[in-house]
């Protein structure tokens, strides 16, 4: 039995049906009219769905999913408002999700710590320092290191002030992103902090400099790993391909194909999930 703790509270899915359809159209390079022709669903109904006015029948959702090469079971579950989420268990360390209001959903930062220690590894820093401090767990007295997944404001807005208040803390970011005082990490970089190891996965797509991070406890090799996925993989969805849709799709499928199914996924937005759950239900897995 592992000495672990996960502080879990409700977090809404990052994307509704309209968001998933819009992203899938962008990823596939399809216009609304072409999708209407391929799916035999009226263009106006597709536009209404993207604008969160849903009047699609189950059969139309199935045809849209097939035309977009989406996982129809997951797409239908999102349309019904009942996307399945797994029980989160098996981590060999403590995980603290920090949920920041962002639009109608949340942006996430995380702190990972050996449960016997008062120092933690911070992944992203949220939109600003004051919100970060309000959410900061009382058991964590000081950050041991900071890892940034990518440079959108809601993920690193609190970084500069956190460094100013805490002093000399190592900061790590993706290659290609210049952050003052930060060390850029490429594919396969490994860093050890006590019992914990952090490994870098280079995952451009949502933006060009983007990393995911795998956290493990090498002394517990059968325990579940943690994937901090930034804006690559969400519960029930994927990031928007602002930079490159082919690279985003390739990295999304790489994560789902290569990581153990027990891997807990800590995304940049929305609730925790697992690789097993997303292999089964994520609409972007076909």
Predicted regions and their residues:
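Short alpha-helical "recognition helix" segments of helix-turn-helix
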Residues: 31-38, 64
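A short, Lys/Arg-rich alpha-helix, primarily the initiator
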Residues: 1-28
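Metallo-beta-lactamase
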Residues: 7, 11, 118, 207-286
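Conserved beta-strand hairpin/beta-sheet module of binuclear metal-dependent hydrolase folds
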Residues: 87-138, 213-229, 235-236
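Core dinuclear metal-dependent hydrolase active-site scaffold
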Residues: 111, 190-222
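Active-site HxH/HxHxD metal-binding segment of metal-dependent hydrolases
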Residues: 55, 127-199
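Recognition helix of helix-turn-helix/homeodomain-like DNA-binding domains
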Residues: 41-56
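DNA major-groove recognition helix of helix-turn-helix/homeodomain DNA-binding modules
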Residues: 59-74
């Amino acid at each position: 039995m592992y000495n672990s703790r996960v502080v879990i509270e409700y977090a809404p899915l990052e994307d509704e049906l309209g968001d998933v359809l819009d992203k899938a159209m962008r990823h596939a390079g399809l216009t609304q009219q072409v999708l209407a022709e391929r799916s035999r669903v009226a263009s106006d109904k597709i536009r209404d769905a993207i604008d969160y006015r849903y009047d699609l029948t189950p059969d139309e959702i199935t045809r849209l999913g097939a035309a977009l090469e989406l996982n129809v079971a997951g797409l239908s579950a999102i349309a019904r408002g009942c996307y399945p989420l797994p029980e989160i268990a098996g981590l060999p360390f403590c995980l603290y999700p920090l949920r920041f209001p962002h639009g109608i959903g949340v942006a996430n930062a995380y702190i990972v710590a050996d449960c016997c220690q008062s120092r933690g590894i911070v992944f992203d820093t949220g939109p600003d320092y004051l919100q970060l401090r309000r959410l900061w767990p009382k058991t964590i007295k000081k950050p041991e290191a900071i890892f940034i997944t990518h440079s959108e404001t809601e993920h690193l807005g609190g970084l500069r002030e956190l460094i100013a208040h805490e002093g000399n803390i190592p900061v790590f970011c993706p290659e290609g992103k210049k952050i003052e005082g930060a060390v850029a990490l490429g594919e396969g970089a490994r860093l050890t902090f006590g019992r914990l190891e952090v490994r870098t996965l280079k995952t451009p797509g949502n933006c060009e400099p983007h990393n995911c991070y795998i956290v493990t406890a090498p002394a517990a090799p059968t325990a579940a790993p943690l994937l901090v996925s930034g804006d690559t993989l969400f519960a029930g969805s994927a990031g928007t391909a602002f930079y490159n849709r082919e690279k985003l799709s390739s990295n999304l499928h790489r994560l789902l194909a290569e990581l153990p199914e027990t891997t807990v996924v800590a995304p940049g937005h929305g609730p925790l999930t697992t690789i097993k759950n997303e292999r089964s239900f994520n609409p972007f897995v076909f």
